[in-house]
Amino acid sequence: MLDHFGIPVKTWSDDHRTLYWSNGHPKHHTNEDDGQLGCVLNCMWNRDPMAHAHVNFTRSGLPIKEMKHIAKVTWGDESAVDQIGDYTPTNTYKMKRLQRVIARTELHNMLGLCSWMAPWEYCPDEKNQYVGDPNMEAKIFSAVTGVNKTGDDLDKDGIRAWMLQRVYTMRQLGSSNMRKDHDLVPGWIYTDPKDRKPFTKGTVRMDPDDINKSFDIFFE
């Protein structure tokens, strides 16, 4: 499509107004909603990812204090989530959360569940500090099918499905080096209209080394 209009890919990639991501597809809930997690997530499929298990948490309306408490309970550390526009450098917990997002996205696609409402890491129960039930999908699945599964079991199933499409993509792409030939981010994520530095409050600008580190951690 880009060749047809005579516009170089770099021109699309460097201009945020195009909403272009990579491999011919647009962005979908990237750094403007979840920092590094949103950026790596958008590279994991061959189109804009219909994934909302991250943004339904960061855009839930909960104060950051409550979100960080839920993050500590669910993923092991408060740093797994940041306030939008007040991002901190990447770490293992952010990428651990990304793995759950990918697993649940595939799971919801297979089970026909709405990926905006689920998963249920949080809930309206103030007495429980808004901590939800990450095993809710497993409870529904077990009740309907009679096959007992835990949330971890279903996450493994989701990752298996995701890895299958990644392997298929490698075959169709003719390359096993997905980091070089597929998992590409656009140049505009490294810019800011006011030239604010990454990790400055008020900007969603990313840092190239930090994004590369995010990929490294995720694929470990």
Regions found by a protein language model. Give the residues of each.
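Extended C-terminal regions of large enzymes
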Residues: 1-220
